[in-house]
Amino acid sequence: MSSINTNVAEKHSYKERVNTDASSLSADGSVEAHRLTIEQVAKIFNTDIINGLSTSQANQTLKDFGANTLGDGDKISLTKIIAHQVCNAMILVLIISMVIALAIKDWISGGVIGFVVLINISVGFVQEYKAEKTMGSLRSLSSPTARVTRNGDDTTIPAEEVVPGDIVHIKVGDTVPADLRLIDLMNLETDEALLTGESLPITKNHLDVYDDYSVPIPVGDRLNLAYSSSVVSKGRGTGIVIATALDTQIGQIAKSLRNNNSVIRKVDKSNGKPKKREYSKAFCGTIKDIFYNILGINVGTPLQRKLSWLAIFLFWGCRYFCNYCNGIPKNRVNKEVAIYAICVALSMIPSALIVVLTITMAVGAQVMVMKHVIVRKLDSLEALGGINDICSDKTGTLTQGKMIARKTWIPNVGTFNVGNSNDPFNPKAGEVSFVNLSPKFIEETDEEIDFKQKLPSPFPENFNNWLLTATLANIATLNQSRDEETGELVWKAHGDATEIAIQVFTSRLNYGRDSLIENYEHLAEFPFDSSIKRMSAVYQSLQTNQIKVYTKGAVERVLNCCTHWYGHEENDELYDNQQLKELTDDDKHLIESNMNALSTQGLRVLAFATKDITNSSIDLSNRESIESNLIFQGLIGIYDPPRPETAGSVKSCHNAGINVHMLTGDHPGTAKAIAQEVGILPHNLYHYSEEVVKAMCMTANEFDSLSDDEIDKLPVLPLVIARCAPQTKVRMIEALHRRGKFVAMTGDGVNDSPSLKKADVGIAMGLNGSDVAKDASDIVLTDDNFASILNAIEEGRRMSSNIQKFVLQLLAENVAQALYLMVGLAFIDDSGLSVFPLSPVEVLWILVVTSCFPAMDLGQERASDDILEESPNSTIFTWEVIIDMIVYGFWMAVCCLVCFVIIVYGEGDPYLGVNCNKSSSSNSDVCELVFRGRSASFATMTWCALILAWECIHPYNSLFYMRQDTDHPWWKQTVIDLWDNQFLFWSVAIGFISVFPVVYIPVINTKVFLHGPIGYEWGLAVGFSILFLAGSELWKWIKRIHKRKANKKAKNPEYELERSDPFKKYASFSRSNTMDRPELMV
């Protein structure tokens, strides 16, 4: 097939290419698809309704029409990135300092500060630009997807790759990826409020054709079209793409909305005509927003905002401190005071922190992609490290999502078993065997049951009727096609995994949907709904004209609709009985006991029912009447095996201090069996009290019936909630929050969006998740795998740990410099002014140049081996970090101060010169002693800062014993550990060496850095650097002693058992209550 067009400019010129009347085209040459039949639209777009476009056809059309996006709405704004670099408190402090320095004609300090500002902005710009590109590509991975048919195969592609002519399938929760001419649907309704303003969903009809060209049809009345960006609120449908990107109806609106963003707050007009107060409130709010945006305290991640507030607080605190100490008592607020205020303020501002944080998060987001995790919101990177409870769905997340029908029970017939089949799509694989006993009887008997290899022939009538219901209450399809790569015939399936499993089972017995559907007319369908957990289809036989309802769903929900069945006895007297019996409560208990027998095997059990419709006047749109007075037919047990890695991941979560909760729509028995198999529930429930066992596994009805106070009094929140509804998930999150938990919640359906937003971290499924769920989530799993959640948490903890490391390193240096400079106020020269023990340029060099690169490299440290065995931590600024920051900073300041004092005062009466704080008046002879002291203390502080970077790798372990479990001698292990992060190694090494040229290069040393060459002072700098290292090691040794004492207090037999058994804390050593209740035991 040829492409629709040869270039974009001709994409609307269909007149020369199709055999259709010109009246079917609008004024601009685009197709008015709502006025055409399905066949005409398919011909215009040169597509096949069954097989869709070919791959080559789709690729060429994509080149011709471009990507299916609304233009450059997500285009990276270079202006905004630059503004973001300038408008944060830390950069603004540097800019203010630069302006002050230039205003008092300290040109060199002002120029150096300006250069540092330029470097910060440049590095920040490059990194944020890269981060924006990375996040843009990640957002495109998690953006709405479309399920299309190409080459006869159903495949999921990014919505932006959809092209005109594609056959697109939509279902509940999907965002329509493009404008569609509907060709097939069932109870399809879409929410078009975004487009038309209509608050109610619009019911679609693909058979409508508006061929009267004299009557204009408004957009909202074109019921045979589905529009891009509308959300499917009910049913399902299939359509041909007729417009993409800006050619869609929503695209036309997008054009008109361009450049309509405003930072101006709107005036509140909700109470009628606004008064002066409303205008004043809007004006003041606008000014506040602009001011806060400039300072960067209401943009960025929570940590970035905290750092901006910290910068503002420290800057003004230091300013007033310096003014008071150096100027106000003497009424001498002059240039010297201003310069010293600048110097101290700079020493307190971690100038490189924002840049380092941005780079770390951008790299972390890229690492997440390799672990099948897409980060949609950077805030979630900070939150992941603090997760201590995960609420996960079962199907497809904890399990493989590849369902295979294993057992079927037909009352008064027996149990059918499928064996030797692990191919979920191939109806020819495996063997179906039979025994005329119920699952309950098989479970209770001690005898070995011999399943017959031959099926009853002919099939019992009740089994035939059940097969018919299983086939028709099902929209999954199977087909065999030739694989393009291997050329072999392979089985392919389209539809829901559960329905595919049922369809494969019926096809094994020659009851495939394709062979039966041509004999029936599909009259109505009521799709599966998570609130009622069943679906029904209404068909009319073309041979007998008989109308029948076919229903399947959760056993208890289907039984509630049933009034009759054919009975059941464990003997041959009523074999294949055709006489209807009223369904009594005892009968329902019997059916439920058979369901339990299947569910305890880990099978997901569904029930089937049917009824004849004899009243021709019945309303086929009334679901309640259609699904009433049904005849129960039988059960099917579907096995969805756990993923091989799930059990190990759950165990790792328990070791990491993370509780795992399964919130599933399955039957309690199935949920409990799978939960025990993967380790969410303990196997031996008799170890626990009756109260705890009841709380561990509950149904949604039981949980929802409890008040908040009753939930809070439970000994443990449920580890498994079966038959879970969307509102149950929200209540579970609220209950966890009340217990101070930090919660991650998984979801895939449109109804999961409230719980995803409520959770601290919302996790959507990338493969089977709806677009609405993805949009509400913080992260998206590209493989729908529970193990990927653990990977995300591990990476989140690594990032949080690394952020703590470089925050500690940078802020400890700030503390050291601030203390050092504040004490330096005591050094008075001959003019009565304080002498800087460090010059402003030295301060900036240490903070920005020397420390920035080691900090960035600390951000890339590998996770420690035991990171998942540590307790969750939801904050960066822990008391341990704060105390470490003060201790390291204080000790560094002491080392530098003593070094300076020894040099200046060691030779007797010191001479601190005159105006040694100004580059313009510096004199090497007058200020020689001060310059030598500065050089030595500068070298000491630089080397101490670099040593601190290595010390921050591990909060407790010695620099010489980073890894305790090694057979290497200490010196060899130290080399291995330091070389492990080669970027950090070379940053530190180059930082050590860089001190020498800065001290010795003429002009730069005396005019810029305000220090001079030194000799024996190098020995002092080396000695005090080693002293700092020794003090740091001593502090870590004290911390290790304290930690060991704390652990000894915690160590006892129960503690050790709890480490190996995460459920030990729930154990009751009085087992009588539970053992007296067999139904609580497994």
Curated annotation (Swiss-Prot):
The keyword Cytoplasm does not apply. One of its GO terms (cellular component) is plasma membrane. Its EC number is 7.2.2.3. Its cofactor is Mg(2+). Disruption phenotype: Decreases the rate of potassium efflux from the cell. Sensitive to high pH. Residues 97-98, 330-336, 829-832, 906-935, 1005-1007 are extracellular. Mg(2+) binds at D393, T395, D748. It catalyses: Na(+)(in) + ATP + H2O = Na(+)(out) + ADP + phosphate + H(+); K(+)(in) + ATP + H2O = K(+)(out) + ADP + phosphate + H(+). Residues 1-75, 120-308, 358-807, 854-884, 957-983, 1029-1082 are cytoplasmic. It is found in: Cell membrane. Keywords: ATP-binding, Cell membrane, Ion transport, Magnesium, Membrane, Metal-binding, Nucleotide-binding, Potassium, Potassium transport, Sodium, Sodium transport, Translocase, Transmembrane, Transmembrane helix, Transport. The active site is phosphorylated in presence of sodium or potassium and in conditions of higher pH. Not phosphorylated in presence of calcium ions. The active site is at D393. PROSITE patterns: ATPASE_E1_E2. The chain crosses the membrane at residues 76-96, 99-119, 309-329, 337-357, 808-828, 833-853, 885-905, 936-956, 984-1004, 1008-1028. It holds the Pfam family Cation_ATPase. GO terms for molecular function: ATP binding; ATP hydrolysis activity; metal ion binding; P-type potassium:proton transporter activity. It is a multi-pass membrane protein. Induction: Induced by high pH. Not induced in response to sodium ions. Catalyzes the hydrolysis of ATP coupled with the export of sodium and potassium from the cell. May be an inefficient sodium exporter. May transport other cations such as lithium. Sodium/potassium efflux ATPases are involved in salt tolerance and maintaining the membrane potential across the plasma membrane in high salinity (Na+) or alkaline (K+) environments. This is Sodium/potassium exporting P-type ATPase 2. It comes from Schwanniomyces occidentalis. The gene is ENA2.
